[in-house]
Structure formats: structure tokens, C-alpha cells
Curated annotation (Swiss-Prot):
It comes from the Eukaryota. One of its GO terms (biological process) is positive regulation of transcription by RNA polymerase II. Transcriptional activator that binds the sequence 5'-ATCAATCAA-3'. Activates transcription of PF4 in complex with MEIS1. Residues 137-243 are annotated as: PBC-B. SMART domains: HOX. Forms heterodimers with MEIS1 and heterotrimers with MEIS1 and HOXA9. Interacts with PBXIP1. Pfam families: Homeobox_KN, PBC. GO terms for cellular component: chromatin; nucleus; transcription regulator complex. Residues 403-418 have a biased composition (Polar residues). Residues 244-306 bind DNA. It is found in: Nucleus. The gene is PBX2. This is Pre-B-cell leukemia transcription factor 2. The keyword DNA-binding applies.
Amino acid sequence: MDERLLGPPPPGGGRGGLGLVSGEPGGPGEPPGGGDPGGGSGGVPGGRGKQDIGDILQQIMTITDQSLDEAQAKKHALNCHRMKPALFSVLCEIKEKTGLSIRSSQEEEPVDPQLMRLDNMLLAEGVAGPEKGGGSAAAAAAAAASGGGVSPDNSIEHSDYRSKLAQIRHIYHSELEKYEQACNEFTTHVMNLLREQSRTRPVAPKEMERMVSIIHRKFSAIQMQLKQSTCEAVMILRSRFLDARRKRRNFSKQATEVLNEYFYSHLSNPYPSEEAKEELAKKCGITVSQVSNWFGNKRIRYKKNIGKFQEEANIYAVKTAVSVTQGGHSRTSSPTPPSSAGSGGSFNLSGSGDMFLGMPGLNGDSYSASQVESLRHSMGPGGYGDNLGGGQMYSPREMRANGSWQEAVTPSSVTSPTEGPGSVHSDTSN
């Protein structure tokens, strides 16, 4: 079939913008007898056809410059042309010939495994799908893995985790909704174009479905990026709130004060008993294992850098001495028997509560009750703080060379006289 459909022929069979051109003699738009009028082309067949092709190409190049009204008018003229069915049948024949190659390229592509992993993770974390409390389940699992009971601090952290996870979920769903809306709008636009073109050229329903799948595959890159960023945000949130290996949290200031006070008041033997650990754990609001770990770390740090902790030891020693003297003035109970811990011996001042001040004698014996009373009266109402001066309460010489702990030596500010063990004087010469 040599006929080509360009539009309704102009009146009088002349050459128009849209006409039905035929290469056969006597065809529309060509004078009878064949060839060019008057034999201008020397009887060469096809000369007029080359000119027609040039006109067609020129019209195609000017399509973009046409207004909407002009385009609608030419589309209507094409649909109403008497040769439209013939043109459509030719296009269907061509479509059947090329249909095999199109069908061979329509193989279903497998789902991206990375996208499947992202979807599974978002479902497990409670971000994707219906809200089922995935954040609460993750928080409970992390609490169980980190050691059992949920402390108030942990409950606050889990509440923060759930609120931030809900915020991530809200952002994810809002962005996913925008993505789906844009994808649906573009798909609808393309489907409308294909339906409009199906009036001119044959477009099968399967081809429309294939085009929709291509559009979705193009948009899937945006979807994958959104899910990837959401998964990264969830992982960062988990590592910050629920990871058991995260950076340890420091104790409260009050708990640290209590532990340091006990450590420096028992510097000669900083190994609290199980009863003392339980008491300290109750005071600090922590577990017994945390108390044990704190004392173990504190002993190691103190041995490694005694000079650095000497000033801190003096501060807590003064606090302990002041608390002891204030307790002695407020209560008049008799002093307790000397403690037998350590080789040097020590005595306990009554009224000191849980804090004890170990003060061995120079000869290795413990002070008697009369010596304690004499020492207390020699201190005067000013307490230890007035009589200690600038001397150090605890000396680095308290530890043996092999790293083991022993009883503290007599403080430099309190010395035993040489004339006899019956009296104790305060030495403020330093």
C-alpha cells in the first residue's frame, strides 16, 4: 500500500498542507497522465514523491510551534479522514510483526533484594505498616538484654526513644505519601496520553501495563532512598538509646559524693564488705554490682595516679573529720571498741554515723578510750578543720611497693608525743 494519510485534500486537487498523496497515476493531487504537469521532470517517476516527503518533514518540524487550537483541529481532521481505517490497519500489521520483540522484553524482573531488606527492617522496627508498638517492643527487648529491671532513668530513655521513633515514623509516612501521590499523578498522565494515542495508533492494554511498570521502576529509586535514610535514622536512634554497648552513663553527683566519701574515709582498706556495698547501693540508687565495679575502678585509678587524687583525698578527709567532730559534740555516747581491721589497728569515734577515721598509733597499738577523749578535748571546739592546718591527711606512702593496701600512717597534723602514750597533742607546726 503506497498511500499515506496526511489529512483532507485541499479543494481542486492542489497541494495542501494535509492531503492524501498517491504515487499512482490519476491519484488525488496529481494530474491525469502521470508524471509532472507539462513533463517538467522529464517523465522521471517519483520526483513528485520526494517533494511530498520534504513537505511532510517540514510539517513535522513545525508541530512544536503550533497552538493548541491548531493541533486539535488537525487531530480532528485526521480522525475524520476517509482513509483513517486503512492507515490504522497498516499500523496494526506492522505492530504484529514487531510484537514478538516487544513480548520478549516483557519478562518480569525480580524484586530488588535490598528493597526487601529495607522493608523487613522497617516492619520489624514498627516504622512501616500499621503501628503495632514496634518501638515499645524494641525498648523492652533492649531493657531485658541490658540487665533485667527497668530503672527510672531507663524508663525515661525508653519514653524518649518511643517519641523519637514516632517522629521518624510520621516523617516516613508523610514523605511516602508524597512519593506515592507524585507517582500516581505521573502514571495517570501517561495513561491518558496512551489512551489518546490509541485512537491513532494501536496500543494494547498489556503495553499500557508495561509502561506503568516502567514508571514505577523509575520511581522506585526515590522510594529506596527514602527507606534507606529512614533505616539509617532508626539505627542511629537505637545505638543512642537502646544499644547495651553504648557509652556508659556517669552516676549522679550525689552518688559520686557518697562513694568518694566512703573510699577516702577507708583509704587504708578500700574494700567494702557486702553489707557496706548493699548500704551504699541503697543510698546511691544503684546496684551492688555497680558499687563493686566503681570501687574496683577507683582503686586502679588511685594507684596509677596517687598525686592527682591526693588533693581530692584531703578534701574528703576534712569533710569526714568535720562530720566526726560535729557528731561527737551532738551526741555523748561512749566511743566504740577499736576496729581490728588491718595490722596497725584503728579506733572509731562515736557519733560519726557510717563514716570512720582510722588513726593507728606509732607503736602499732590502737588508741584507748582515754586517749580518744584526750584527743577530742585537745582538738577544741573548732574541730579538726582548725587544727589540721595545711598538712595532708593521707599520704601516698599508704601503699606498699607491691601495690597492696595497708593501714594509713599517722597523719602529719596529728602526732603521738614521745613522753608517753597517755596523752595526744595537736601538732600545727607545719
